[in-house]
C-alpha cells in the first residue's frame, strides 16, 4: 500500500534534516532532549509544540497545564456510556482531530501527517510496546516522527503520576500547575477511605470477561487496585501467583469454575460500556458468589488520565459508587 503523500513528504523532510545535521556530534546544539520510560532518547531542535497523544495522555497533559500543545489524539472509541469513559475536565478530547484507524493499533497516516506533530506520546505496559499502536504501526511512525511513552507497567499511582510529570516538566510545564491535582488526589483518597469504612470495608474482586472466561485481576499489576489495597486498606482479592496468566495481569477462569473466588463487591471492566456487567449477570455459577447474590456491582473505570487529577477524578467517582451500595 502506498504511503499517503503527506506522510511521505514528512519522511523526506526528516531525512533532509538528518542529512544536514549528520556531520555534527555536538549535542549542545540540540535545544530539547528527553529520555522516555522505554529508554528512548529523543532529540529535537526545539521544545515540542504540537503533540498527538493517546487520549488518556492528552487528558493528563491538559491536567498539567499543557492542553494547548495537544493537536490530535488516538485511542479507544468513545465509551457508549460517557459516565464510564475517560473523564477529562481540562480538555474536550472528543473535539480534537482523531487519527485512530479502523482497527486496534492503526493510525490514519494521512490525517496524522496533516497535523504536523513534533511528538507522539502514548503509554506503555513494558515489553517495548507502545499502547494502542501495533508494532508495525509504531515502527512505521518511528521512521517519521519521534515517539515517547509513559510507563504504566506495574506502577503505583504515585509512580504513574511521577512518570507523567517528568515528561510534562521536560515539555515546559510549571510545577505549580500540578498542585491542584495533588490536593484533589489527597482529598479524594480521604473521601474513599471514609466511604470504605462506612460500607464496612468490603472485600473486592476486579473482573473482566469474554464469552468463554472470567478474568480476575491481579492487584499489583494495576495502579488503581494497588491504591485501594495499600492506601485505602481494602481487601482486594489477589490470585495466587501460580494461577496467573502470562504477564501476571489476570487469572483466567472458565465460567464453570467462576465461583472459585468470592468477595463482597465485584468491580466490572467498563471498557465497551456495560457489556462486562451484563456478562457477569448472565452466568449461573458466578451468581453463587456473595457480590452477585447481593447485586453488589461497581464499575471498574479503566480509562484514567495518568495524572494526579485523573486519579483524583476516578477516586471521587469510586467513592460515590461505594456510597451507593447502602441505597
Predicted regions and their residues:
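Bacterial Sec-exported substrate-binding components of ABC uptake systems
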Residues: 2-6, 10-11, 16-63, 174-208, ...
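Short helix-initiation/N-cap motifs at beta->coil->alpha
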Residues: 36-39, 99-108, 245-254
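Short helices/loops that flank or line small-molecule/ion binding pockets
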Residues: 46, 106-116, 252-262
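A short, structured surface patch at a secondary-structure boundary
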Residues: 50, 54-111, 115, 119, ...
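Extracytoplasmic substrate-binding proteins
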Residues: 138-211, 304, 308-327
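Structured C-terminal subdomain patch of bacterial secreted/periplasmic proteins
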Residues: 143, 257-327
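Alpha-helical, coiled-coil/dimerization segments enriched in small aliphatic residues
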Residues: 217-250
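Solvent-exposed loop/turn segments at secondary-structure junctions
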Residues: 57-60, 76-79, 126-129, 153-157, ...
Amino acid at each position: 500500500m502506498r504511503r499517503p503523500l503527506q506522510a511521505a513528504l514528512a519522511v523526506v523532510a526528516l531525512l533532509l534534516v538528518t542529512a544536514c545535521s549528520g556531520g555534527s556530534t555536538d549535542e549542545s546544539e540540540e535545544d530539547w532532549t528527553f529520555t522516555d520510560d522505554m529508554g528512548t532518547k529523543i532529540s529535537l531542535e526545539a521544545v515540542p509544540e504540537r503533540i498527538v497523544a493517546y487520549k488518556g495522555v492528552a487528558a493528563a497533559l491538559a491536567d498539567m497545564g499543557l492542553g494547548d500543545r495537544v493537536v490530535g489524539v488516538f485511542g479507544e472509541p468513545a465509551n457508549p456510556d460517557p459516565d464510564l469513559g475517560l473523564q477529562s475536565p481540562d480538555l474536550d478530547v472528543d473535539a480534537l482531530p482523531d487519527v485512530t484507524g479502523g482497527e486496534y493499533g492503526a493510525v490514519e497516516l494521512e490525517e496524522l501527517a496533516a497535523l504536523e506533530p513534533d511528538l507522539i506520546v502514548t503509554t506503555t505496559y513494558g515489553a517495548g510496546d507502545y499502547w494502542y499502536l501495533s508494532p508495525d504501526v509504531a515502527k512505521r511512525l518511528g521512521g517519521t516522527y519521534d515517539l515517547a511513552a509513559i510507563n504504566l507497567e506495574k506502577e503505583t499511582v504515585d509512580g504513574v503520576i511521577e512518570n507523567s510529570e517528568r515528561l510534562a516538566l521536560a515539555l515546559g510545564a510549571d510545577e505549580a500547575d500540578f498542585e491542584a491535582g495533588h490536593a484533589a488526589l489527597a482529598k479524594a483518597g480521604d473521601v474513599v477511605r471514609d466511604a470504605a469504612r462506612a460500607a464496612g470495608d468490603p472485600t473486592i474482586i476486579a473482573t473482566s470477561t469474554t464469552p468463554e472466561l472470567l478474568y480476575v485481576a491481579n492487584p499489583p499489576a494495576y495502579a488503581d487496585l494497588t491504591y485501594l489495597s495499600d492506601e485505602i486498606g481494602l481487601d482486594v482479592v489477589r490470585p495466587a501467583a501460580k494461577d496467573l496468566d502470562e504477564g501476571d495481569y489476570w487469572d483466567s477462569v472458565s465460567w464453570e469454575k467462576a465461583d472459585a473466588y468470592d468477595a463482597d463487591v465485584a468491580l466490572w471492566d467498563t471498557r465497551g460500556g456495560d457489556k462486562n456487567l451484563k456478562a457477569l449477570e448472565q452466568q449461573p455459577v458466578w451468581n453463587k458468589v456473595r457480590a452477585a447474590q447481593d447485586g453488589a456491582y461497581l464499575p471498574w473505570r479503566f480509562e484514567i488520565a495518568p495524572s494526579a487529577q485523573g486519579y483524583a477524578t476516578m477516586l471521587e467517582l469510586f467513592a460515590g459508587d461505594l456510597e451507593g451500595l447502602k441505597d
